[in-house]
Amino acid sequence: MKRVKVIPAFLFAAIVAVCLASCGAVQNPVEYNNKLMTVVNDNEKSMNEMNTAMAGQDYTKAETVRKSWTEKLDKAIGEVDKMDALKEDEGLKTAVVNGLKAYKKIADNDYKTLIDLRNKEKSGDATVQLQIQASLTKINNGFDSIAGQINHASTAFEKKYNK
């Protein structure tokens, strides 16, 4: 009977185990969904900071939050872009990336406009009220649209993988 060398056999088994464990292309749908939703939900912290600053009429802080938020969104977009899409995911990752880009556009443009208008209002310019209302409506509608698109994609993803 032939003797099998234990070390080479053990080393081979270890290499196979590591290769199988590191195959990132085969992902768990629940983990994939959770990771994407965590990235999206992390924006809530910045939204809350923005709301607190705006409600307190601290527009200098609001501008600081806005800039920080856009940086966080850039990182989040990059993180999701680098993720391997789950095989046959036809929309969730795309919806999340598009949603993050839309949040960034709101933070970059719409909140900047709103902060500028609120500063003018605080300085006594009462003529900006209609513009403020229009900005608030645009921001809220944008948030609703983003949430709707991500929720729609998430529901479709759940139906597909919840078999």
Feature locations, PLM:
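Bacterial N-terminal signal peptides that target proteins for export
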Residues: 1-12
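C-terminal motif of bacterial Sec signal peptides marking the signal peptidase cleavage site
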Residues: 18-22
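Immediate post-signal-peptide N-terminus of mature secreted/exported proteins
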Residues: 23-71, 159-163
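Short, charged, amphipathic alpha-helical segments
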Residues: 34, 60-68, 90-98, 126-138
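Charged, amphipathic alpha-helical oligomerization/scaffolding segments
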Residues: 35-45, 49, 68-75, 79, ...
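Short, charged/polar, low-complexity loop and linker segments
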Residues: 49-52, 75-88, 122-133
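Short, solvent-exposed, charged loop/turn and helix-capping segments
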Residues: 76-100, 113, 117-118, 154, ...
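A charged, solvent-exposed segment within the mature domains of Sec-exported extracytoplasmic proteins
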Residues: 118-163
